[in-house]
Amino acid sequence: MNTVNASMTVIGAGSYGTALAITLARNGHSVVLWGHNPEQIQKMQRDRCNQAFLPDVAFPDTLLLEADLARALAASRDVLVVVPSHVFGDVLRQLKPHLRPDARIVWATKGLEAETGRLLQDVAREALGEAIPLAVVSGPTFAKELAAGLPTAIALASTDAQFAEDLQQLLHCGKSFRVYSNPDFIGVQLGGAVKNVIAIGAGMSDGIGFGANARTALITRGLTEMTRLGSALGADPSTFMGMAGLGDLVLTCTDNQSRNRRFGIMLGQGKGVQEAQDSIGQVVEGYRNTKEVLALAQRYGVEMPITEQIYQVLYCHKNAREAALSLLGRTRKDEKHSA
């Protein structure tokens, strides 16, 4: 690819990165999509689709493929990072030497930093410094539906008001893709991490066969845990009633397109953690997120009993049914003021 002036460079050619790149290109923008595997990028260029993840969706003419990172980043000041959370910091450090002087970074990655449990904003600042404007997009989005042009809505938050306005204009499409701005940078990030954990729990409940009542209770109390942790970190509690909180939580807990939910279902049916992960065949973000969210909650003194029981299943070999019964057997609580 010769050097071009693109509206956005997307880093990450998995299902979600590809879907976002397709959406941007459909909006009439020139978009460069970069992936870490040159052979995959060459195949996508030949096929003009992502056969591995979205085989039925043809690329718009304005979606350009690039295997050379320096050229991809030279094409646009605005860079959308869509990679798993456990490699987020490594990818940003890889990008930094090639970023334009006027670069701005937005990510659609959902989760916390592996091992440390830090918010991705802290990872980004450490990797990139203080000067680069940052933003995050999050909300109820399945890649296949987004790529198919089905109606979707997300939330957008940024450290920079102009960047937020520019991104909203770039992403928003009145026909299918609605983008809500939100000033709560912490809350929009956190919702996407916690919902992954609760979705595993909802899946486990369904895998056991507990039914719709139990699933709904888990979603509702999971939202309480999300809001409580967010408040401790300085987020606006109302954020968690929006797209990046309740919206993403309901979607991920109730639809089998969710890898986290399917992973939980298999655990509820008695499969082991490794067997369930192997069966999914893609990254199950909630597996790592559970450890990270619980560590963050403990650091801030926030009680999260659902997250604790999911952790026990994933990392301490507790049976999923026993974990559910542990939650049911807790002492009576006041709904509004207790975990």
UniProtKB/Swiss-Prot annotation:
Catalytic activity: sn-glycerol 3-phosphate + NAD(+) = dihydroxyacetone phosphate + NADH + H(+); sn-glycerol 3-phosphate + NADP(+) = dihydroxyacetone phosphate + NADPH + H(+)
Homology family: Belongs to the NAD-dependent glycerol-3-phosphate dehydrogenase family.
Record GO terms (molecular function): glycerol-3-phosphate dehydrogenase [NAD(P)+] activity; NAD binding
Active-site residues, Swiss-Prot/TrEMBL: 195 (proton acceptor)
Protein name: Glycerol-3-phosphate dehydrogenase [NAD(P)+]
Binding residues for sn-glycerol 3-phosphate: 110, 139, 141, 195, 248, 258-260
A Gene Ontology cellular-component term: cytosol
Positions with a binding annotation for NADPH: 15-16, 36, 110, 143, 259, 283, 285
Gene Ontology BP annotations: carbohydrate metabolic process; glycerol-3-phosphate biosynthetic process; glycerol-3-phosphate catabolic process; glycerophospholipid biosynthetic process
Coiled-coil region: none
Organism: Serratia proteamaculans (strain 568)
A Pfam family reported for this protein in Swiss-Prot or TrEMBL: NAD_Gly3P_dh_C
Metabolic or biological pathway, per its Swiss-Prot or TrEMBL entry: Membrane lipid metabolism; glycerophospholipid metabolism
EC code: 1.1.1.94
InterPro entries registered for this protein in UniProt: 6-PGluconate_DH-like_C_sf, 6PGD_dom2, G3P_DH_NAD-dep, G3P_DH_NAD-dep_C, G3P_DH_NAD-dep_N, NAD(P)-bd_dom_sf
Cell compartment(s), UniProt: Cytoplasm
Record keywords: Cytoplasm, Lipid biosynthesis, Lipid metabolism, NAD, NADP, Nucleotide-binding, Oxidoreductase, Phospholipid biosynthesis, Phospholipid metabolism
Function: Catalyzes the reduction of the glycolytic intermediate dihydroxyacetone phosphate (DHAP) to sn-glycerol 3-phosphate (G3P), the key precursor for phospholipid synthesis.
Domain of life: Bacteria
